[in-house]
């Protein structure tokens, strides 16, 4: 069974990942077995998104004692909720065990401290050209199909938690739940695969989402406008994408009575964590400033992103903060560039992500507000590309570009004004630039008398034609290679350059 949830939060409170965590907690208590939950980010250009345009998906793959439960459905005294009486299950430990998954924590606990286990794990990561874990294929091919009573039980749990932890007072919060409890044919999987591509690169309408839900035999629950079903189905559809590149995020949640108060996360410990775990964790600090803790009143204390669960567990132990109520590790498409597609400039369209290659065709322009604009041209057309003020020093790179430079830009395209918001660039080839030597052999200065008259020395009076003036090559301050915006200005989906060697990508 697949469960998709989206649009429960607002800029003031709550968080869809917290809702997902509470649901996992309740399902584990009832003996349900789940794969690692997913946090899926979608097209960042959607105007009606609440915060990060991300949906959550949970996948039930079994139930402890399910067969015993079916045999004893008629037994009114059966009160173990599907858990066999001979199985001791520590519900307090359930969420912790779920997050740990199949990690050998007995071995890790024998290490002298978290730093030594971290060094051991980093050593193993360094030996890999590309880090990518795989789930057990025996349980990922098909999800567990619930009985009618189990389905109603799960549906009730999901809807009640969504209803309790949604900011219904916010006009832009429109929750939606999608449930799939049927075997999916190859045709239905193909439909979901295409839908995943759509929610990443297009603006999907509510009608389109409802039509797809009907085609694949799913059920949905809409609250208010119900726009959340678009992202809920999008999160589910990630299972059927050909691109299974992923990262992880450990989300630590605050104790309820601290929601809305100032967060206590020691910045120096975050900087230390980043130094110890980089590049296997990412987007932790910007200019030595902690950026893992949000500024909203939501339940999240902080979120650490990385390439493996093990790295995140160790990173969590290094960060010093207020008490953590609970935490969850989500498998995500963050930092994967899933929202970008390689295309010609003529094929680029508004509200989508693009990878465009071409030549700089005009000098940069400074725009009010501190933004910097350049024009990129290929054989099919031209487009303006912008580095906004929050990208700070990255704008210096854009200013160093010159007419004739061959570059590739990565980013999303605005509707109005029509331009590409730069996330990173690859300077493929720098154009050779020259300047005229304005000094005469006698040491005097050559003054221009117009294109037709050439130059005249102000000291000896010697005249030179325009094309007789010697040229020297200008030494460029810019070097060929990749450049990216700082972490604080980076989109959730944008791949940091630090991950090039660890995730399959379009950058290599």
Curated annotation (Swiss-Prot):
Top-rank taxon, per record: Archaea
Pfam families, sorted: TiaS_FLD, TiaS_TCKD, tRNA_anti-codon, Zn_ribbon_TiaS
Assigned EC number: 6.3.4.22
Catalytic activity as recorded in UniProt: cytidine(34) in tRNA(Ile2) + agmatine + ATP + H2O = 2-agmatinylcytidine(34) in tRNA(Ile2) + AMP + 2 phosphate + 2 H(+)
Record GO cellular component, one term: cytoplasm
Keywords for this protein: ATP-binding, Cytoplasm, Ligase, Nucleotide-binding, tRNA processing
Disulfide linkage: none
Top enzyme category: ligase
Protein name: tRNA(Ile2) 2-agmatinylcytidine synthetase TiaS
InterPro entries linked: NA-bd_OB_tRNA, TiaS-like_TCKD, TiaS_FLD, tRNA_Ile2__agm2C_synt, Zn_ribbon_TiaS
Role played: ATP-dependent agmatine transferase that catalyzes the formation of 2-agmatinylcytidine (agm2C) at the wobble position (C34) of tRNA(Ile2), converting the codon specificity from AUG to AUA.
Keyword field contains Ligase: yes
Annotated family: Belongs to the TiaS family.
Gene Ontology terms describing biological process: tRNA wobble cytosine modification
DNA-binding region: 367-427
Gene encoding the protein: tiaS
Gene3D superfamilies, per database record: 2.40.50.1010, 3.30.70.2200, 3.90.600.20
């Amino acid at each position: 069974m697949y469960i998709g949830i989206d649009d429960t939060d607002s800029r003031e409170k709550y968080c869809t990942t917290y809702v997902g965590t509470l649901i996992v907690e309740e399902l584990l208590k009832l003996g349900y077995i789940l794969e690692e939950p997913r946090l899926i980010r979608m097209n960042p250009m959607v105007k009606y998104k609440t915060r990060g345009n991300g949906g959550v998906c949970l996948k039930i793959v079994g139930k402890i004692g399910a067969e015993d439960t079916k045999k004893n459905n008629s037994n009114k005294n059966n009160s173990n909720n599907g858990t066999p009486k001979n199985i001791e299950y520590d519900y307090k430990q359930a969420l912790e065990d779920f997050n740990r998954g199949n990690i050998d924590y007995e071995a890790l606990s024998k290490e002298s401290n978290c730093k030594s286990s971290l060094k051991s794990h980093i050593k193993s990561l360094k030996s890999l050209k590309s880090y990518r874990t795989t789930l057990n294929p025996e349980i990922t091919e098909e999800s567990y199909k619930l009985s009618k009573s189990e389905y109603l039980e799960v549906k009730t749990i999901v809807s009640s938690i969504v209803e309790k932890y949604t900011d219904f007072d916010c006009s832009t919060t429109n929750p939606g739940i999608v449930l799939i409890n049927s075997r999916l044919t190859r045709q239905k999987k193909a439909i979901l695969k295409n839908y995943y591509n759509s929610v990443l690169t297009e603006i999907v309408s509510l009608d389109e989402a409802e039509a797809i839900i009907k085609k694949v035999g799913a059920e949905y629950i809409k609250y208010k406008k119900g726009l959340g079903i678009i992202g809920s189905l999008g999160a589910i559809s990630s299972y059927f994408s050909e691109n299974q590149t992923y990262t992880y995020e450990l989300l630590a949640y605050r104790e309820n009575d601290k929601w809305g108060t100032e967060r206590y996360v020691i910045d120096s410990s975050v900087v230390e964590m980043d130094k110890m775990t980089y590049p296997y964790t990412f987007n932790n600090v910007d200019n030595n400033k902690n950026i893992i803790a949000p500024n909203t009143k939501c339940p999240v204390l902080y979120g650490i992103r990385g390439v493996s669960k093990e790295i995140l567990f160790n990173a969590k132990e290094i960060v010093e903060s207020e008490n953590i109520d609970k935490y969850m590790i989500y498998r995500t498409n963050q930092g994967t560039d899933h929202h970008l597609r390689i295309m010609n400039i003529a094929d680029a369209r508004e509200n989508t992500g693009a990878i465009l290659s071409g030549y700089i065709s005009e000098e940069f322009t400074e725009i009010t507000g501190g933004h910097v604009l350049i024009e990129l041209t290929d054989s099919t057309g031209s487009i303006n590309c912008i580095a906004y003020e929050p990208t700070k020093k990255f704008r210096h790179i854009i200013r160093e570009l010159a007419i004739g430079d061959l570059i590739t830009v990565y980013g999303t395209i605005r509707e109005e004004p029509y331009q590409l918001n730069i996330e990173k660039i690859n300077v493929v080839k720098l154009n050779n630039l020259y300047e005229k030597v304005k000094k005469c052999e006698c040491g005097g200065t050559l003054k221009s008398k117009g294109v037709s008259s050439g130059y005249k020395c102000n000291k000896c009076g010697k005249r030179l034609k325009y094309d007789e003036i010697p040229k020297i090559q200008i030494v460029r301050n810019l070097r060929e290679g990749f450049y990216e915006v700082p972490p604080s200005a980076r989109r959730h989906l944008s791949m940091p350059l630090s991950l090039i060697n660890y995730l399959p990508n379009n950058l290599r």
